[in-house]
Structure formats: C-alpha cells, structure tokens
Amino acid sequence: EGSGGSGSSGHFTTGSNVHMSSVTNTSNGGTGGTGTGTGTGTGTGTGTGTGTGTGTGTGTGTGTGTGTASGTATGTASGTATGTANGTGTGKGTDTHTAGSGSGSGTGTGTGTGTTTTTTTGNNSSSSTPPVTLTESLLNK
C-alpha cells in the first residue's frame, strides 16, 4: 500500500488496492544423449612349435688287394674302406635323409583405443501470470 505524497502540481493519494503479479518460470532439463564410438587395436603374439625328423644312411665299399692275401673293404655312411694283407681299398658311401616336420601354435593379445561422441537435446519453457494491476485515487489535482 502507498501513502500520500505532495507534488508541485497538486496533492494526490494512492489508493489501497495494489495487486502485484507473480511470475513463475519452469525449465525442463535436457534429455539424455546417445553416443557411438569406434576403436582400433593392434596385438602381438608368440608361438612355440616342435618338430621331429628321421634320417637313414647306406654305404657301399669296394677294395682291391695285392700280395699274398686278398683285400677286404668295408663302407660306412661316410664312405671309408680299409684293406688288409698288403691290400688297399677304397670305399664310397651315400646318405639319405628325410626332412623333419613340425607344427606350432601361438596366441596373441591386443589392446585398442576408441573415441565416443555424445549429442544432447533439451527444451525449456516459461510462463507468467498477468501483469500488475494498480488502482489509484487522485485527489486535489
């Protein structure tokens, strides 16, 4: 409520009916966002394997001898021959070998990094009541 006041143009009194309005604002929070991400990774692995192989060798030898006794010769895989009783001998040998075979298995581990993007949407609203109404009574104008 207002009280009386004086002015250069006259005396006036403000009436007692003063209505103030109230203003309310409401705001709704934004809704949650969705995000997608992609990542790439590299990994290293180690493996162990075992293999087996077999080989065989054969040898032949020939010998000749001179003297009172005949010569003998033996052959080994490396192909050597000896002679006895004044005899000399030579020998030749051959080796055959099959290649070994093996198998192995390994395991690997990797790490990756990714990026994620997020978007968020929201809405806001506000409302208010009608403005102030003022009733005045002017006297002695």
Curated annotation (Swiss-Prot):
Superkingdom of source: Eukaryota
GO cellular component: nucleus; perinuclear region of cytoplasm
Biased segments, Gly residues type: 29-68, 101-113
Keyword DNA repair: no
Chain spans, region Disordered: 1-141
Region (32 X 2 AA approximate tandem repeats of G-T): 30-94
Post-translational modification: Phosphorylated with a circadian rhythmicity, probably by the double-time protein (dbt). Phosphorylation could be implicated in the stability of per monomer and in the formation of heterodimer per-tim.
Entry keyword annotation includes Repeat: yes
This protein's UniProt keywords: Biological rhythms, Cytoplasm, Nucleus, Phosphoprotein, Repeat
Sequence repeat extents: 30-31, 33-34, 35-36, 37-38, 39-40, 41-42, 43-44, 45-46, 47-48, 49-50, 51-52, 53-54, 55-56, 57-58, 59-60, 61-62, 63-64, 65-66, 67-68, 69-70, 71-72, 73-74, 75-76, 77-78, 79-80, 81-82, 83-84, 85-86, 87-88, 89-90, 91-92, 93-94
Regions of compositional bias (Polar residues) in chain numbering: 11-23, 130-141
GO biological process terms held by the UniProt record: rhythmic process
Residues spanning the signal sequence: none
Subcellular compartments: Nucleus; Cytoplasm, Perinuclear region
Bias (Low complexity): 69-85, 114-129
Subunit field text: Forms a heterodimer with timeless (TIM); the complex then translocates into the nucleus.
UniProt function note: Essential for biological clock functions. Determines the period length of circadian and ultradian rhythms; an increase in PER dosage leads to shortened circadian rhythms and a decrease leads to lengthened circadian rhythms. Essential for the circadian rhythmicity of locomotor activity, eclosion behavior, and for the rhythmic component of the male courtship song that originates in the thoracic nervous system. The biological cycle depends on the rhythmic formation and nuclear localization of the TIM-PER complex. Light induces the degradation of TIM, which promotes elimination of PER.
Domain notes: The run of Gly-Thr is implicated in the maintenance of circadian period at different temperatures. Deletion of the repeat leads to a shortening of the courtship song cycle period, and thus could be important for determining features of species-specific mating behavior.
Designated name of the protein: Period circadian protein
Organism the protein comes from: Drosophila serrata (Fruit fly)
